[in-house]
Amino acid sequence: HHLLGCAADLIAGSPDDHRLLFRLIQETHELCGLEFTQLILEPGARWIHISYVPGNLRCQVIDKEKSPN
């Protein structure tokens, strides 16, 4: 998705900041219907991947800290 200009890796500061931002985006999706294609918390919470591909808004949430595969 990055090569299509439909994704970004967000860097919020510390790993704890990344976890907090990930949860905030996830909760905003659940409570307010925020749409995206993928939301991924990378291992070690180094960054958050988020993508938005029109026509493919599956709202897939992956926490690689909980499940590294």
Regions found by a protein language model. Name each.
Residues 2-6, 12-69:
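Catalytic cores and adjacent binding grooves of peptidoglycan-active enzymes
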